């Protein structure tokens, strides 16, 4: 039933990238059993401190032992004779919450829980509410019933996810992993030049986002170089040579259902 005016002894647990029993230890840093960070520490390490009424109980994802319900109200309304209810049926109805105090409100700093007391408005202190009885949530703030769902809560409306604009898509595609559109055009033009083209036509649709077409009058790879070019991916790295259409033709050859064959002289398209 303590007043949580002092800082949590586990304020450093959020700095650890590998939070666990060795990083947290037993509850020896802090005696505030209901501090938010203390609950986090107990969840990570189990509850092994002698100051807790249920030592050794594993904690659930909410930070409480699965066999007990911790609900109290720190402050003047707290009952000093508070006993943990063993079952949900033992939790008193909402009219008795003022005297029995079976719900707790945890004051925390704004950086730990950036939300306001829904009853007090924007000027209220940040709170964390837990419990199961929703019967008095429409009553004045003397009621400590929990909010309808798990917290923490924020007062401002959720921001809608904005679609990525086409310029950003192009910038993403220009990263080191995916070739940019300009690089793709450059490679196709170089392929046409390597194929002996003297006249090259370039067509782009929506700045290359939907279509990139490069056509020229080149004759393609010379027949004597074709077989060596297609087999180069299967050769040792020290034996590979950069021939003809660089790796573009190699990729098409490996992914096609029937191997490409040399074509007679005439206009070619890439």
Swiss-Prot record:
Q: Name one GO molecular function term.
A: kinase activity
Which InterPro entries did the record assign?
HATPase_C_sf, Uroplakin-3, Znf_RING/FYVE/PHD
Q: Which residues form a coiled coil?
A: none
Task: Report the domain of life of the source organism.
Answer: Eukaryota
- Kindly state which keywords UniProt assigns to this record, in alphabetical order: Kinase, Transferase
| Disulfide bond found in the keyword field | no
Relay the record's extra comment.
Encoded by one of the numerous copies of postmeiotic segregation increased 2-like genes scattered in the q11-q22 region of the chromosome 7.
Q: Which family does it belong to?
A: Belongs to the DNA mismatch repair MutL/HexB family.
Q: What is this protein called?
A: Putative postmeiotic segregation increased 2-like protein 11
């Amino acid at each position: 039933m303590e007043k949580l005016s002092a800082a949590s002894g586990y304020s450093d647990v959020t700095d650890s990238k590998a939070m666990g029993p060795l990083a947290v230890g037993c509850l020896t840093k802090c005696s505030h059993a209901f501090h938010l960070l203390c609950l986090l520490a107990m969840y990570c390490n189990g509850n092994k401190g002698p100051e807790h009424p249920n030592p050794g109980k594993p904690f659930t994802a909410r930070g409480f032992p699965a066999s007990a319900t911790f609900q109290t109200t720190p402050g003047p309304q707290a009952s000093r004779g508070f006993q943990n209810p063993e079952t949900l049926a033992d939790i008193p109805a909402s009219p008795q919450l003022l005297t029995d105090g079976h719900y707790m409100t945890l004051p925390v700093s704004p950086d730990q829980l950036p939300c306001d007391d829904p009853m007090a408005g924007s000027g209220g202190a940040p709170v964390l509410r837990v419990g199961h009885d929703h019967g008095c949530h429409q009553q004045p703030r003397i009621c400590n019933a929990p909010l309808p769902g798990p917290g923490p809560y924020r007062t401002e409306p959720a921001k809608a996810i904005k679609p990525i604009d086409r310029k950003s898509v192009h910038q993403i595609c220009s990263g080191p992993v995916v070739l940019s559109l300009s690089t793709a055009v450059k490679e196709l033009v170089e392929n046409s030049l390597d194929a002996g083209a003297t006249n090259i036509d370039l067509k782009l649709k929506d700045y290359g986002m939907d279509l990139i077409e490069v056509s020229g009058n080149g004759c393609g790879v010379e027949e004597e170089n074709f077989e060596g070019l297609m087999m180069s991916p299967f050769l040792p790295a020290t034996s590979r040579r950069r021939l003809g259409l660089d790796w573009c033709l190699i990729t098409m050859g490996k992914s096609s259902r029937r191997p490409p064959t040399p074509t007679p002289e005439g206009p070619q398209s890439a």
